[in-house]
């Protein structure tokens, strides 16, 4: 009863101003004390884990380890050179002959240029299963400039019998280390790649850093999951000090009934990898894949043995050659060739509409197309004569790329790809598009030519007999982008579409000299001004965007100065306008029907108003404007 009376009197107490001030002061004091106590706890105890991490010992340590191990990826992601794996980003590593899905552990082999990819019943990569692990965190990323997939896993070792694989005895279980070191993490890094210079080779690099006080152990499963597939047989080959496994078999029959013979050699790996405390492990597993052409099952019995032996001899020879090489040299060779191949490209600087692909989409598409395209020019077995012929084809001024730009072709620059099979179909579509647009010579060269054609097509660049012309649509120049590494004669040209502070687009051209210097000139649309000689100065050269009537290319680049000077007399133009003037003519404002409707409504309103006034003062029964004095109502 007493408490009820006091509660009834509480609103009256708070109605006074001094009571409200006192209550606010007390609340502020409580907040200050809480912040001071939490700061003291942080200063005294260092980093405090969240409650969920403290309730599960060690749950946050792998995450912190992973954050430190992948910190260098942030800058690469910002520059569009690294793409985390996830939905819409298949884990593909390929070199035009081999294609491997690292996530689903599948292998595709392309027997020939016009033949579809074959999927042998063979699991390509080694699977690593850590022993005695109580917590784990991992992340994978495609490194576009290195041509590989990198997967990082941080493993927290537990006491023997606490991990998911505790039922498997081994040295790690017998280490007898105390639980006090269970909060340390082991860093496992795997690199997956299909070698760019050796089309039959793919590899998996395993690096394990064990800073703990206990032995770290990994169970290896592979290269086939479980027993060898029924379509394959395996033998252990011993040559000198080297041992490797030889797998022989056939692919699944094609719809036509034809089959392919497949031979795979693999470096032999122990069943369990062990890393002593405070040490590191660096192991590279190599594979060599050879495949025959399509064979009819009836012919397989008579010619199959001879064909299979020839494939086995090729695979043995290449595997022995690889085993004599340092693994680091093989990796460095791949990274160098891939960086050289990926030097041209497209850089998206500013996007103002929803139909233009993002920089991530462009770089990922270029990576996938390079991965699915062979590069015979990079093969070490290529003869000097064949190399010269391919270089001449690559530098030939073909009529590539004819037609409109592909910048807004969503089927060529898809925002998401769901599977490796979809990537292979996209590669076929790109090759067909380039061949139909005058780029047959570039497609024939392989990956360098296909990349050149894709860069040309993105911006609407086209080679003619005498010059290189930039024929982009003037209406899409509100997007800023740069095209790098365009081959012209012995030099590389960089062309960028930029926007100034007032929102007006302009062109920036720079030159990278390669080999014998050649004079190159450029002039904007119509060549109204004298051509400018392009040099390799760091600042480059800028050109204003001029639009002609009728529309012609926005920029001409040529080694023939006289040809550019003659263009102004042979184009036969009606007018040459600045870009903003052209856009003003293209978009004069609201349509005529709108203004006609507004004028009609205004006219009708005034006619209606005039009718009201007329009926009021001049119509039947209208009141007089002025009243006389004799009016009795006055």
Swiss-Prot record:
Glycans are attached at residue 363. The keyword Nucleotide-binding does not apply. Residues 41-589 are extracellular. InterPro entries: K2013-like. It is a single-pass type I membrane protein. Keywords: Glycoprotein, Membrane, Signal, Transmembrane, Transmembrane helix. It is found in: Membrane. Residues 1-40 form the signal peptide. This is Uncharacterized protein KIAA2013. The gene is Kiaa2013.
